[in-house]
Design a protein with these regions (language model features):
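Long, compositionally biased interface segments
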Residues: 114-169
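Short, solvent-exposed recognition patches
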Residues: 1-119
Length: 169
């Protein structure tokens, strides 16, 4: 895991800036399907996130066109021991990258993995790539600015990290 901070303007009318903190997670799966990676819809509630809503989005990647990702929105009480809760809004983008495949869909990943193991003897060794970003009035980061910054970082990182010539897209 890594944290990435870059200053971005809050508004066109105000000269001040605020950091947009993007948390980057890259997890590689093992050979054992039973102990392999899963999706954040399972992990985030265990970390205190609630009100999860998900959509499929298209994100441009520098020099490689558009990729589909799952985008989740969630809320988290960051003061659980206090009588007055402070609720933080977050967005989470994720995608699974295999030996020859990329998908934003957990079920598609599972079916591809089973088919490739049975028919071709290929273990995809999936990589799970996720970027999470907090936003909202409480931290003075508008949702649209957080989205732009997050998608820009996705583009920058995936354009360098993925072996694009090996993917069947």
């Amino acid at each position: 895991k890594a944290d990435y901070v870059q200053e971005v303007p809050i508004s066109l009318d105000a000269p001040e800036t605020a950091p947009v903190l993007c948390r980057v997670s890259i997890v590689k799966s093992g050979h054992d399907l039973n102990n392999s990676i899963h999706r954040p819809e399972r992990c985030l509630p265990a970390q205190g996130h609630f009100n999860l809503t998900g959509t499929k989005v298209e994100v441009p990647v520098e020099g490689h066109g558009i990729i589909r990702m799952t985008k989740l929105k969630s809320q988290q009480n960051i003061t659980p021991d206090q009588p007055q809760p402070i609720i933080l809004d977050s967005m989470h983008y994720y995608v699974f990258i295999g030996h020859r495949h990329m998908t934003e869909d957990h079920l598609a990943r599972t079916l591809t993995d089973m088919k490739d193991r049975v028919l071709y003897g290929v273990d995809q060794r999936w990589c799970y790539f996720q970027i999470s970003t907090a936003y909202g009035d409480k931290i003075k980061v508008p949702e649209e600015e957080a989205r732009k910054q997050t998608e820009r970082l996705i583009s920058q990182l995936l354009s360098q990290l993925v072996k694009w010539d090996e993917l069947d897209r």
